[in-house]
C-alpha cells in the first residue's frame, strides 16, 4: 500500500511539474511571437478577390513565364507560398519596394525578376547541363532559388548595396 501511495505521489509531482513548465513556457514567449503583425500589403488576385501579404515574407516578384502559370499575371513568392495577381509588375514592385528594398535581375529568358536583397542567403554559379543555358548564377534564399543571367560577382555587389 505504501508503494502505491509513493507511486501516486511521484506521478502527481510529475504532473504538477509538467503543468508548471508548460505555463512558464507560455508566459516567456519570444517578443516576436506575441508582437502584433506589421502592415499587410493587399493585392488583387486573378479571381477578383484580394490577398493580404506580409511584406516581410516576400522574397521574389516576377511576371508569369511558364506554361503551367496563368498568362499575363504577376507572381509574388512569399513564405513558401505563391500568389498570382492582376496588378502590373511596375505597380507590385512600387508597392513592395516602398517597404522592402528590391534588386532587379534578369531571368534566363530575358524577363526581369525582383528579389528582396535581405532574403538572399547565397549566390552560386550556374550548373552546366543542369541550369538554363543563359543562366550564369543562382540566387539562393531560404524559400527557393532563382537562376539569372547576371554573374555571381555582379549579384553579390548588388545585394550588398
Predicted regions and their residues:
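Eukaryotic intrinsically disordered, low-complexity regulatory linkers and tails enriched in Ser/Thr/Pro
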Residues: 2-161
